UniProtKB/Swiss-Prot annotation:
Protein's cellular compartments: Cell membrane
NCBIfam families in alphabetical order: HDIG, RNase_Y
Main location as per UniProt: membrane
UniProt topology in membrane: Single-pass membrane protein
Organism field: Geobacter metallireducens (strain ATCC 53774 / DSM 7210 / GS-15)
Keyword Transmembrane helix appears in the UniProt entry: yes
Name of the protein: Ribonuclease Y
EC nos: 3.1.-.-
One GO BP annotation of this record: mRNA catabolic process
Length: 520
């Protein structure tokens, strides 16, 4: 019974709870719905207000933009109106200027028409006067011919001959004046440049000879050098191609030969043999071979050193070897290697004074005597041989031409070629640079005087300054001042054609006029 009552109570409580819950849920739901409706209504109202605000702002912005666009359009229109007004004003001014110019042209055209008419009238008057003058000239010519007894052709010829003689005399005088002025200016400038070059480069070297002397520790060494029945000296001469002269000279052996390279090889080999003490044919051949290698190395180093000292780079190795061989070549007892260096330095100094390429000038000066390094088997002058070698080993045409032209084998047509000629003359022609045999020297003086006296009008001639100047005394009755200038050039050309000489020779023609009168 109690259980049933409990169940009934539980069921009643559950029903009551369900009822109360439904009532509460319904009330809460109604409250939430009303709040949601209020919130939605509020959101809608806010959205409407915001939309109205945005719409108003957009309308205001649009109105503002329209206003600004109108204002900008008005400004543009105003500026365009101003530009158009300015353009219209300029066009009006141009039109006025054109009108003025047209009026001016019309005026000038009228003036030119008047001038043309005046010139035409004047021309007609001149034609008439010319006809009258021609008639008068013909009449006067007939009178002159009848008076002088000469035809017009003969008179014209006499006049032309007189004018030609006078013109030649004036031309000769003018040429003399111009040449003197040019010579004074050129001599002064060239002397300044050459003097500066010589002062800035003062090279020193000892002239080579055709013999070398090897010192011996004692005269007993001479017998060892000769060997049994002369076998050592024969082996040494055969290996080197040099003659050994063993005479009464104390403690010395003389090496004689015209090939300086072979002579140097023989000298080095003999010195090594003397130092070593073992002297026999087998040892001689071995030492000579080593000496040849040493000389070849010396030649290569000499070529490299020359290029380094001058600051000239990019020269072919074969050319450098030939330059090194010049160390063992001489010309009139002047060492060609030192001469080439001297010419290169002088060329560079003069080139810097003249404002031309210094490196190129030094290169041409160094290579100008390249042909002298080649043995006699190659035919041709050393200038031609040197130019061919330079061309073969890739030197520029300017360098090749300078080498070819330095002894007039080709006419010099560049400043560089003339510079090399001048530097070569400076190095070779200065006193003491070169020597020649007494017989050659005397013959050269005789040839100079013979060539000078072979010309008409020459009374006497004297070779002075060791044959570097020839003074020619001419007759004042046969040779005029103008003719003396031409005579000096003719003598110089004949000397160049018939003689061989180092440097240059000055031809000095002297004409003396003496006026004698006696006071009584």
């Amino acid at each position: 019974m109690k259980i049933e009552i409990a169940i009934v109570l539980i069921l009643a409580a559950a029903g009551l709870g369900y009822f109360v819950g439904n009532m509460l849920r319904k009330r809460i739901s109604d409250t939430l719905v009303s709040k949601a409706e209020e919130l939605a209504s509020k959101i809608v109202d806010d959205a409407k207000r915001e939309a109205e605000t945005i719409t108003k702002e957009a309308e205001l912005k649009a109105k503002d933009e329209v206003f600004q666009a109108k204002a900008e359009a008005e400004r543009d229109a105003k500026e365009k109106r101003k530009d158009l007004q300015a353009l219209e004003k300029r066009l009006q001014q141009k039109e006025e200027n054109l009108d003025k110019k047209m009026n001016l042209f019309d005026q000038r055209d009228a003036d030119l028409t008047k001038k043309d008419q005046a010139l035409l009238n004047r021309e007609q008057g001149l034609v008439q006067k010319e006809e009258r003058l021609d008639g008068l000239i013909a009449e006067q010519r007939e009178k002159l011919e009848s008076i002088s007894g000469l035809s017009s052709t003969e008179a014209k010829k006499i006049l032309m001959d007189a004018m030609e003689s006078e013109a030649k005399l004036d031309a000769a005088k003018r040429i003399k004046v111009i040449e003197e002025e040019a010579r004074e200016t050129a001599d002064k400038k060239s002397k300044e440049i050459m003097a500066l070059a010589i002062q800035r480069y003062a090279g020193e070297y000892v002239a080579e000879r055709s013999v070398s002397v090897v010192a011996l520790p004692s005269d007993e060494m001479k017998g060892r050098i000769i060997g049994r029945e002369g076998r050592n000296i024969r082996a040494l001469e055969a290996a080197t191609g040099i003659d050994l002269i063993i005479d009464d000279t104390p403690e010395a052996v003389i090496l004689s030969g015209f090939n300086p390279v072979r002579r140097e090889v023989a000298k080095i080999a003999l010195e090594k043999l003397i130092t070593d003490g073992r002297i026999h044919p087998g040892r001689i051949e071995e030492v000579v071979a080593k000496a040849e290698e040493e000389v070849e190395q010396t030649i290569k180093e000499a070529g490299d050193q020359a290029a380094f000292d001058l600051g000239v780079h990019g020269i072919h190795p074969e050319i450098l070897k030939l330059i090194g061989r010049l160390k063992y070549r001489t010309s009139y007892s002047q060492n060609v290697y030192q001469h080439s260096l001297e010419v290169a330095f002088l060329c560079g100094i003069m080139a810097s004074e003249l404002g031309i390429n210094v490196k190129q000038a030094k290169r041409a000066g160094l290579l100008h005597d390249l042909g002298k390094a080649v043995d006699h088997e190659v035919e041709g002058s050393h200038a031609v041989i040197g130019a061919e070698l330079a061309r073969k080993y890739g030197e520029s045409p300017k360098i090749v031409h300078a080498i070819m032209a330095h002894h007039e084998d080709e006419k010099p047509n560049t400043v560089l070629a003339v510079l090399v000629q001048a530097a070569d003359a400076l190095s070779g022609a200065r006193p003491g640079a070169r020597r020649e045999m007494m017989e050659t020297y005397v013959k050269r003086l005789d040839d100079l005087e013979r060539i000078a006296t072979s010309f008409v009008g020459v009374n006497n001639s004297f070779a002075i300054q060791a044959g570097r100047e020839i003074r020619v005394m001419v007759s004042s009755d046969e040779v005029t001042d103008e003719r003396a200038v031409v005579l000096a050039k003719d003598i110089a050309k004949k000397i160049e054609a018939e003689m061989t000489y180092p440097g240059q020779i000055k031809v000095n023609v002297i004409r003396e006029t003496r006026a004698i009168e006696y006071a009584r």
